[in-house]
């Protein structure tokens, strides 16, 4: 296929996407706190991940900037973490995560997408079976696709099927990994993490990978997610989170044991071969993490307001399977 043929094929596919209502485009919006301005219309923003309002909190932003040492306002790491990009603030954030979660170690990544796309290919080989919920995020699916592991996607939250698969295949693989989200971004339902922990313990050499992207900051007494809420943090082998949603920053992280952390540093391609986040971004994440612990009122407000909206929608005849702030 030459260039012209490829261009024509792309054009035809774009036309088909438009005809089916699936053509994506970048909206020319202006943000104004909780409002969005688009095509001369002012609309309430109900589509962002700024769950606690931190991104639009001008006072919080000013407090951070007022107390920031100008020598730490470094806007580029200029390197990967394995070369010269591993600034001291990385260790500061990872120590705080380790202390908060009471786990052996933590590792910060350039994005949540890099995190999910890189961990599974690093730890899973051809002797590994991945059992993933049907509705896990695209970044997890992409990570599974480029891994050498075999994968079976069990029906969404069908834990009877999951147990059947564990029972059927555990003798045929060196290890198995159960992969799930704690709060599913598509429909807002919550995984029963204690049940998954129970299943993990029942079958030898089975590990549990939980993406808490939509739960960190907003669930649990200290905002550490559903795992904190259900008191099962120690039982989760790879507890993943993001700074890009409730924390109003950028990047991803995993808390795990030290051996797994060291292994990821050596084998995780999306960690090794990418430029580290700017140090000033990590300074902001560190600041927000410390603030987040005490944002219990904000978490309660989010839960109450989500329930009010859900009830209002139900009165209008809409239904929702959500048991979280995602409606």
Predicted regions and their residues:
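Conserved PLP-anchoring active-site segment centered on the Schiff-base-forming lysine
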Residues: 119-138, 159
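Conserved N-terminal alpha-helix of the aminotransferase class I/II PLP-enzyme fold
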Residues: 62, 66-111
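Active-site phosphate-binding strand-loop segment of PLP-dependent enzymes
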Residues: 152, 156-210
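N-terminal "arm"/small-domain region of PLP-dependent enzymes with the aminotransferase-like
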Residues: 9-12, 16-75, 206
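Active-site PLP attachment segment
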Residues: 228-263
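Substrate-binding/gating loop at the entrance of the active-site cleft, primarily
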Residues: 111, 131-147
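Conserved PLP-dependent catalytic core of the aminotransferase class-I/II
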Residues: 191, 286-327
């Amino acid at each position: 296929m030459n260039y012209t043929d490829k261009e024509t094929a792309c054009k035809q596919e774009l036309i088909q996407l438009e005809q089916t209502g699936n053509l994506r485009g970048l909206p020319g919006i202006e943000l104004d706190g909780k409002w969005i301005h688009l095509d001369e219309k002012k609309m309430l923003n109900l589509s962002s991940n700024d769950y606690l309002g931190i991104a639009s909190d001008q006072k919080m932003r000013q407090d951070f900037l007022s107390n920031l040492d100008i020598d730490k306002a470094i806007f580029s790491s200029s390197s990967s973490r394995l070369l010269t990009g591993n600034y001291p603030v990385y260790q500061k954030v990872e120590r705080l995560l380790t202390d908060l979660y009471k786990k052996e170690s933590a590792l910060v990544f350039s994005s949540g997408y890099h995190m999910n796309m890189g961990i599974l290919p690093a730890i899973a080989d051809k002797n590994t079976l991945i059992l993933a919920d049907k509705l896990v995020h695209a970044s997890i699916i992409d990570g599974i696709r480029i891994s050498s592991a075999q994968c079976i996607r069990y029906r969404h939250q069908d834990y009877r099927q999951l147990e059947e698969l564990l029972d059927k295949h555990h003798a045929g693989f060196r290890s198995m990994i159960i992969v799930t989200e704690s709060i599913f971004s598509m429909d807002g339902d919550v995984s029963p993490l204690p049940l998954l922990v129970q299943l993990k313990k029942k079958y030898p050499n089975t590990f549990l990978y939980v993406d808490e992207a939509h739960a960190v900051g907003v669930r649990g007494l200290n905002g550490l997610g559903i795992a904190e809420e259900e008191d099962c943090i120690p039982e989760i082998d790879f507890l993943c989170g993001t700074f890009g949603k409730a924390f109003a920053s950028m990047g991803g992280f995993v808390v795990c044991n030290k051996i797994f952390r060291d292994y990821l540093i050596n084998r995780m391609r999306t960690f090794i071969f990418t430029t580290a986040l700017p140090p000033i971004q990590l300074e902001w994440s560190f600041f927000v993490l410390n603030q987040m612990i005490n944002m219990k009122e904000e978490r309660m407000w989010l839960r109450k307001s989500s329930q009010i909206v859900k009830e209002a929608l139900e009165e209008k005849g809409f239904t929702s399977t959500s048991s979280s702030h995602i409606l």
